[in-house]
Amino acid sequence: MVLAPGSCHRRALSSSQDAMVSVIPASQVSIALLEERYGLRETTQPDFFGEWTQGLEELTELEKQYLDRVKTHFKRLLKNPPLLENSVKMVVLSPLLDRAGFYDDPFHIQSEVSVDIAAEDEGQMIRGRIDVLVLKDRFWILVLEAKRSDFDVNVAMGQALAYMLANPESEQPTFAMVSNGQSFLFLKLTKTPQPQYANSRLFSLVNPGNDLYEVLKVMKRIGKMVVAEPQSD
């Protein structure tokens, strides 16, 4: 089987069990399929994904004030529909990437091929797109863009795990963040001794306070790990 997020995706998932190569569009990739074909398993071990709760640096007051403005801007957009499909990146994601330092050396953001998605809600077909960014081949950021800002982040979990499984790096864990601008979910995957993953809790701008504080902390934590840990040749 080959995963085809787009016509020119630079990696592919392959299965030696397949007599013939079959192409699976990324929009159709599910966690169940990855479990069946690649032995992927979800782990409930509390210490498997400690990066989203442990070793987090406190934010400065200026950073908190900045994130408060980001949340205010997003809530203002919600009150004045329709949302532009690229508003997620402009209002929420870009400020987070900036504050996490991902626009600066030694990070280098690469864009993957976008994936078209569709879901039915109360008889209406909702169409959207998943834009994929990758940092140093270790940290994937998937952004769901649609007319509705509450497009469930679970829609992109299968795609995120597929990108992580396709990474040729096998010794180091890989991470992903999935966001629709309103909700954020982090994932961690390791390949040895067998592929397994876990996710963080769901962070949401609907929650009291400002969950962007924790989101930025986790982004910084994972970013430092990606830079610090050596990559195999």
Residue ranges and their predicted role:
Residues 176:
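Short glycine-aspartate micro-motif
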